[in-house]
């Protein structure tokens, strides 16, 4: 397995575990074996993501898979300096895609990078992220 940047593990309703990671504008995902330390097949590139940078997170809502990630902050340059990361998301009917980019769900915080997680806790949805 290649080195992992910002790995994320998602366990689906049927108990199947998946691992995702990404950096350098490429996001990959793959099935894990039951021991959750070995791949069950090859990692594959996640298709359909727009401006992917890093910080992959997967959650499932109403039968759809949501992949959220930090973008390359290419559109929000300020005086020739790259701006801060925004959080984007994409949806799919399959945990390994293909994905349909849905846009930005959070503008930059006061931190150059961002990494978010969306979780359900006691029936309520929360988005976690970091800033300075």
Label for each model-derived stretch:
Residues 1-132:
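Carbohydrate-active catalytic/glycan-binding domains of CAZyme proteins
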